[in-house]
Amino acid sequence: MSSLRTDDDTWDIATSVGSTAVMVAAARAGETERDDALIRDPYAKILVAGAGTGVWETVLDSEFAAKIENLDPEAAAIFAHMGNYQAVRTHFFDAYYREAADAGIRQIVILASGLDSRAYRLDWPAGTTVYEIDQPKVLEYKSATLREHGIEPVAQRREVPVDLRFDWPTALHDAGFDASLPTAWLAEGLLMYLPAEAQDRLFELVTELSAPGSRIAVETAGVAATDRREAMRERFKKFADQLNLSSALDIQELVYDDPDRADVAEWLDAHGWRARGVHALDEMRRLDRLVELPDDPDRAAFSTFVTAQRL
């Protein structure tokens, strides 16, 4: 059970769950600077720089990795692994959306979109509409910041400012969503912030709204062993002050580590979808982005990338 969450909590881009979107965007910004980048997000740095978290802007420093290496080489390996994970995850779901577009799907829904910039940076076919669902202040920050820099979406982008714990299907319909058309859904970086029951309800609603031929891609919620989680927390504390990261939220305090959470692929297979999964570590290995860690990671602590098609 999360210790910092309540049933009706809200946030903006610099607080609570909202700040995790800045963390992820910082990882995309770092990846974009690499010569061998798996993805290119030219807008991530802009979104991080203006967020005002006072924390993740630090990661934009080109010397950040070297500073960690000097303080704690093993921690540097962990940070490199985390950055590679974000790059591989983004790469996987970018490919998912390109395949959906190639299949003729023109209705896109991004659940808890955060600072996702796909509406702006992917080469969407004409006639594509991207619906982004998230907290009102998060959506407002993203669109306003990019607009200030003269950046406009490639696809038709429609904001759906609503909490996924409330009546988001009505808000989605009000924004123009057509349930009779095939949809490509995305739940990336979301499930760990939902209780197990809310996860089931989310997929029930998505299924109700999905015409035959619809697709969904999901990042599952990994479950880290308690001792490993505590060890990581203590290691982070050792150098956080020296890197201006001491005010960073403890992400583990925001997630719901529910042991009875349904297996996503099994749930989808049982409810009218045909699903398959790729474990994150296997995908990282395939793309030559698997970093050797000081402790052999438990596969259960890492996500599986699930894709499915509505029958």
Curated annotation (Swiss-Prot):
EC assignment: 2.1.1.-
Any one biological process term the GO annotation gives: methylation
Record key words, sorted: Methyltransferase, S-adenosyl-L-methionine, Transferase
Alphabetical list of Pfam families matching this protein: LCM
Residues holding S-adenosyl-L-methionine: 134, 163-164
EC category name: transferase
InterPro entries membership: Ppm1/Ppm2/Tcmp, SAM-dependent_MTases_sf, SAM_mthyl_Trfase_ML2640-like
The keyword Membrane appears for this protein: no
Gene Ontology molecular functions: methyltransferase activity
Function: Exhibits S-adenosyl-L-methionine-dependent methyltransferase activity.
Stated family: Belongs to the UPF0677 family.
The protein's name in its UniProt record: Putative S-adenosyl-L-methionine-dependent methyltransferase MSMEG_0095/MSMEI_0092
Organism: Mycolicibacterium smegmatis (strain ATCC 700084 / mc(2)155)
